[in-house]
C-alpha cells in the first residue's frame, strides 16, 4: 500500500505498557477481541474454554504451538495469547440459532425462544460443521434437507439446532483431549451462548 513507516509503532507483545491516561496505565490488548475475552476469563490452568458467539472458538491455553498432522487435518490453529499460545478451533456457533429465529420467529424474545426450545421433544440433529449451514438462502430448508423431513414446528428446528451445537462441542472436546493427551473435567463458556441454559445442559452431557 506504500504507507509511510512513521504511521506504525514498533512491534510489542500483549500486556506491554504503552503509556498512561489520567493516571491509568494503558496496555496493549491480547491481539484481538476474542483473545482478550479468553484473557479475561478466570480459566484454571489446563482447562478448555468456549467462546460461544455467532461463531464458536473452543480451545486451550498451551505453552507452545501444537503443529502435528492431526491438528492440521482437524483445522486446529495456534494463536497468540498473553505469554501462552491459544490452541483452538473455530466451529459453528449461534449462527444456526440466530438464522432460524430470524426466519421462523423474528418477533419473539430470546427468553421466549428458550421457552419454546425447551417445550420441544424433537431429538433430530445435523452435523453443525457441514458447509451447507455456512450461508444458506434458507436455514430452515438446509435443516429440512439434512434431517430428510419437512413440516416441523419452529420449536423443533430450534431444539435441533441446540442439540447439533452441543454434539459439535462434544466432538471438538474429544479431539482436543486426543490432540493434547489430556482429560478435561471442566469447560469454561463465555459469550451470548452462555445464556442458553438448554445448550449448556446438553453441552455438559456431550462433553462428559
What is each residue range found by the language model?
Residues 22-187, 195-208:
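Active-site core segments that coordinate phosphate-bearing ligands/cofactors
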